[in-house]
């Protein structure tokens, strides 16, 4: 009876400690994996945004509306892209892969804009983490990642004959690209499931090993 009581308490203590350690490990692993996947998506989104802006740069410089519109439509039709928009400094959408957006105004107090505006004035430079946002169109919709890329007034812009932008105007507009996170969220869920299965399996296996060791090294000697 005494041996069984000691063995039971010892087993319970070891299992409780193991459960706590493995649970903490699982939580941190899930969080780290999720953050790593999201950082990779943010990096990819930033590269896509820079590529799109560079690809449209020549057409914007020559104010070629048709080519800009065609380029944005082509990019917006890609499976990994949800929508591509370009709006001017005033917040009016002038190009979009969704034509119903064109001509509408963006709320500068919305999440996609507030990082660029401080008391109504856009800041000059933004880090990648400050240019991205994660949101849902509605509570039941999949998550989306959006990235904004300010279009700065370079010398080739304010010296071009077809443009009327003064040299003092720093930001001409913003390129906004949104990408679905459906695949990323699926990978996150799979990783979470794998970590949970590993944690549960480790706890069960450790419990069996501890029970056998306690029975062999504690219960049997005490009974003798």
Q: Predicted segments — roles?
A:
Residues 1-9, 30-38, 182-194:
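Juxtamembrane/transmembrane-helix boundary motifs in multi-pass membrane proteins
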Residues 2-31, 198-206, 210-213:
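Extreme N-terminal signal-anchor transmembrane helix of membrane signaling/transducer proteins, especially
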Residues 13, 27-48, 57-68:
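Membrane-proximal amphipathic alpha-helices
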Residues 34, 210-224:
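Cytoplasmic juxtamembrane amphipathic helix immediately C-terminal to a transmembrane segment
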Residues 55-110:
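Extracytoplasmic/periplasmic helical hairpin
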Residues 75, 174, 181-182, 188-190, ...:
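Domain-level signature for proteins that mediate thiol-based redox and metal-cofactor handling
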Residues 101-193:
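Extracytoplasmic
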